[in-house]
Amino acid sequence: KYLSKEGYATGYIGKWHLGSSEPVKKEDRGGYDYWLGSNLLEFTSDAYETYVYDGQNKKVFLPGYRVDAITDAAINFIKLNQKKPFFLFVSLIEPHHQNNTDDYPPPIGYREKYTGKWSPPDLSSLVGSSPRHLGGYYGMVKRIDEAYGRMIDVIKSLKLFDDSAIIFTSDHGNNFKTRNREYKRSCH
């Protein structure tokens, strides 16, 4: 809201996870001008079938791998708003466990590329799901790196990079069922 008052175009794309309903009510969206999100993206979509809601709460299908679909929407927002200051919050769900199946679904071809590769020694010594899941997890992380690289490339090509602040954060890592029988929710 504050940035909008200062003339910024504001946008939110991806997983919200702060609302109490699906789709998220307009008054619960933090005041963003542009909205393309879902409160619980892991329940409204899967790796290759991404559904979000637009500013009018209409369900929107985004084609392709979910990281790529959200990234494509973000790049579109950047291009449409390049002539004025903008604030864009991109919330990727990956590298999140897919809730409807015991898997970390990476892009096609990425699981094979990373399965059997390096595993942190402390993780390898614990009983859990890392031998089965780490290849998919690493593939998801690699695709996130590529996605942010794509966004940064667009920002650079539009000559916006020197006047931009890019902040990357994460809400949780993963313990691969080594601390409890779930993939997260452990205090350690």
For each predicted feature, which ranges?
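Formylglycine-dependent sulfatase
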Residues: 1-188
